[in-house]
Amino acid sequence: MKKAKHWYDYLWICAILYFTLGFFNILFAWLGMIDFLLPLFLAIFGGNKYFCSHLCGRGQLFSKLGTDLKCSRCKPTPRWMSSKWFHYGFLLFFLTMFGNMVFQTYLVAAGAASLREAIKLFWTFRVPWGWTYTAGTVTDWVAQFSFGFYSLMLTSLLIGLIVMVLYKPRTWCAFCPMGTMTQSICKLKNKD
């Protein structure tokens, strides 16, 4: 008997839509804040990882590609990727990159730096992305945040796709920074 489908089983489409919209207009990168705030909100007020289990479009996309379309080798995830040290180390690295992005946005807002119309993949490789933004549409700091945030989201998607192909479809979920943060919140909340 087939499992009944729910509306949230199709959120993988939102992940594709997000990256497609950002390819044509960088300002759509702000929509990614939903994936940053909603898991934290649900963990704080719900005390669970409902977002990760049901609402994460990226995890669903990896399942769809890896399992349904057989793009994954389905090899076991290396133990070190599931270790506490790797989880928190990757989270710290990720938060450092996020903090740097926010700082760059601040510098643009303060007039101390100019807008960089480029995506940085893997926090290193500059990819010109200027066609996605028309100067003057919004203030420069709003655009700078968009470029930085889209860089972060696209880099994490690429990391997730790489580990999906090499290992199990949802290997990214084993060390996803949002999953690590929500897990920590749930542990703290359930101690009470």
Put a short name on every predicted segment.
Residues 1-192:
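Non-ligating segments of multi-cofactor redox enzymes
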